[in-house]
Amino acid sequence: MPEEKQKKSVLEKALKRIEENFGKGSIMILGDETQVQPVEVIPTGSLAIDIATGVGGYPRGRIVEIFGQESSGKTTLALHAIAEAQKMGGVAAFIDAEHALDPVYAKNLGVDLKSLLISQPDHGEQALEIVDELVRSGVVDLIVVDSVAALVPRAEIEGAMGDMQVGLQARLMSQALRKIAGSVNKSKAVVIFTNQIRMKIGVMFGSPETTTGGLALKFYATMRMEVRRGEPIKEGKDVIGNVISVKIVKNKVAPPFKTAQTYIIYGKGIDREYELFNIAVNEGIVDRKGSWYYYTTLKGEEVSLGQGSSNAVQFLKDNPEIAGEIERRIREKYGLLSVEKEEQRKEKKSSGEEAS
């Protein structure tokens, strides 16, 4: 027993010295309930994807990779994340390495262009230095890098067209992520990298698909999301959008390999009400009787949403209070009411009661 007490005393002194030298929180006991905090997130902008992540969105203090084929919806998801971060009062930055950001489309998705930080870097080193500086500032909540494939090293840009530059981009990403990863965790920012798919030559077995930029991002990313474009969404004979399937291929904060399906309308982004309606029907929150759809409110009142899915979706668009109540019930069912969102809702409710 005396030896145990002595060990405990020595350990406490060591922990105290570490905290004095490196700051509070630099070391902690994992099982201490006062130290373990729920995962803070920035919503994805899609209820289905929020559910698939297992925590309700992109985890703060982490690196996220969104990858997929061309025109699969990667940038759309990134812009929706920016809009959500701004709604929460956060600061967002967009590193446009592709030099292809459409401000009109971003605005249609809900992005506040007046407060959005944007950079169009000349080369990969500049882009990643800007990311590092923004993360270290501690005041930026979300940084999107679009995309890894466009982060061309300076040596490649300055070299001749036919020069062999083996592994330059992979080394650049590896070096940069070593610096950024530690800073991200302390700043509580989310850094989203969008990435493209390439084909490995000569693969006989397994998938020939891989992502650009080497292996570093795969290791440092807390969450990796694979985006694939599905069947077209039609209005009559006209194609107005696409079904998008998302698979969480890596997740360090919740069980991985969950999938989600969402609906992107060209020029408008994710159709939230259509997505909400489908989830609510599948979860039994919205009832179907013949071709009619009904919802029973928390007060016990049965509300008719309309005949047919299109009318029901339009009803949800026209009645955001009911849509919001349905969404909260779904989030509560999956335990996804984040601390920040819940606090905002309580503040709005209390301010409304005070006003009345």
From Swiss-Prot:
This is Protein RecA. Belongs to the RecA family. PROSITE patterns: RECA_1, RECA_2, RECA_3. The gene is recA. It is found in: Cytoplasm. It comes from the Bacteria. HAMAP family: RecA. It comes from Thermotoga maritima (strain ATCC 43589 / DSM 3109 / JCM 10099 / NBRC 100826 / MSB8). SUPFAM superfamilies: P-loop containing nucleoside triphosphate hydrolases, RecA protein, C-terminal domain. ATP binds at G68, Q69, E70, S71, S72, G73, K74, T75. GO terms for cellular component: cytoplasm. GO terms for biological process: DNA recombination; DNA repair; SOS response. GO terms for molecular function: ATP binding; ATP hydrolysis activity; ATP-dependent DNA damage sensor activity; damaged DNA binding; single-stranded DNA binding. Can catalyze the hydrolysis of ATP in the presence of single-stranded DNA, the ATP-dependent uptake of single-stranded DNA by duplex DNA, and the ATP-dependent hybridization of homologous single-stranded DNAs. It interacts with LexA causing its activation and leading to its autocatalytic cleavage. PANTHER family: MITOCHONDRIAL DNA REPAIR PROTEIN RECA HOMOLOG-RELATED, RECA. Its main location: cytoplasm.
